[in-house]
Structures are given as C-alpha cells and as structure tokens.
Amino acid sequence: MLSIIQRVNCAKVVVDNQKVADINKGILALVCVEKEDTQQNFEKMADKIIKYRIFEDDAGKMNLSLVDIDAEIILVPQFTLAADTKKGNRPSFSSGCPPEIAKEKFKEFENIFRRKYNKVQTGIFGADMKVSLTNDGPVTFSFKI
C-alpha cells in the first residue's frame, strides 16, 4: 500500500464538472492499493495518516495530527503510484492490481479509515478526477506499508 499525503489549506476533487469532495485545512492523500494488501495494511496506513504529526503547534513545530486539529481529509484513489518506472520512458502497470479488485480494496480501506476518523471525503475510483489544492508549506510525505 502506498500513499502520498500533503498538508493543504484547501483541496477539492471534481468529476464531470461536479464537486465530489471539498475541504479546507487538512490533508489530501493520494492512495494506491496493491495486490498483496490486506486489512492489516489498511489498518496500519489509516493509523499512520490519522496520527502523523504534520500540523504546527503554537511553537511552529510539526507536532499536531489530523485528529489534534480536527481537520478534514480527502482520500484520492491513485493507481499510478504503483507504476514501475525503472525501464524506458513510459510507466508500466503490469504488476498492478486489476481495477475491479483495486476498487474493492480501496473501498475496504475507506471503510476502515471512516471507522477511525469521521471527517473523510473521497475521490471516485476509476473516474477522471480534477484535483486541485493549495499546499501548506509545502509539506508532503510518502508512505509504503
């Protein structure tokens, strides 16, 4: 399981000219599920993102989590994070999870995430999404579980 999280002042996801997710201060998380991912991976990733201290405290130190500041998050499914880029000039997705399985796995991750934290919005799996955000920092982290 892979994720890139970004601390944002605002973010939104639009599909077919319709806004499907819209947050103010919080996290935009690009999430990629892989073939071998299990519920345990989903639990660990959700905990990591929810508890990761990327927001500044009163002293300006990154010491506060999503929960600490009661912020929102958008989970955006992004299979391209699993691309093999080692050879040539075109990404390969041959080792990726088939779309129908990846969709089920992403939904399972989303459900686990929602059980742990309630201020969650999502993009739409498989849709052509227009994602816009205003980075805060920028502060960006990459996770592999």
Curated annotation (Swiss-Prot):
Its EC number is 3.1.1.96. GO terms for molecular function: D-tyrosyl-tRNA(Tyr) deacylase activity; Gly-tRNA(Ala) deacylase activity; Ser(Gly)-tRNA(Ala) hydrolase activity; tRNA binding. One of its GO terms (biological process) is D-amino acid catabolic process. A motif (Gly-cisPro motif, important for rejection of L-amino acids) lies at residues 137-138. Keywords: Cytoplasm, Hydrolase, RNA-binding, tRNA-binding. One of its GO terms (cellular component) is cytoplasm. It catalyses: glycyl-tRNA(Ala) + H2O = tRNA(Ala) + glycine + H(+); a D-aminoacyl-tRNA + H2O = a tRNA + a D-alpha-amino acid + H(+). The keyword tRNA processing does not apply. InterPro entries: Daa-tRNA_deacyls_DTD, DTD-like_sf. Pfam families: Tyr_Deacylase. It is found in: Cytoplasm. Gene3D superfamilies: D-tyrosyl-tRNA(Tyr) deacylase. It comes from the Bacteria. It is an enzyme of class 3 (hydrolase). A Gly-cisPro motif from one monomer fits into the active site of the other monomer to allow specific chiral rejection of L-amino acids. An aminoacyl-tRNA editing enzyme that deacylates mischarged D-aminoacyl-tRNAs. Also deacylates mischarged glycyl-tRNA(Ala), protecting cells against glycine mischarging by AlaRS. Acts via tRNA-based rather than protein-based catalysis; rejects L-amino acids rather than detecting D-amino acids in the active site. By recycling D-aminoacyl-tRNA to D-amino acids and free tRNA molecules, this enzyme counteracts the toxicity associated with the formation of D-aminoacyl-tRNA entities in vivo and helps enforce protein L-homochirality. Belongs to the DTD family. Homodimer. This is D-aminoacyl-tRNA deacylase. The gene is dtd.
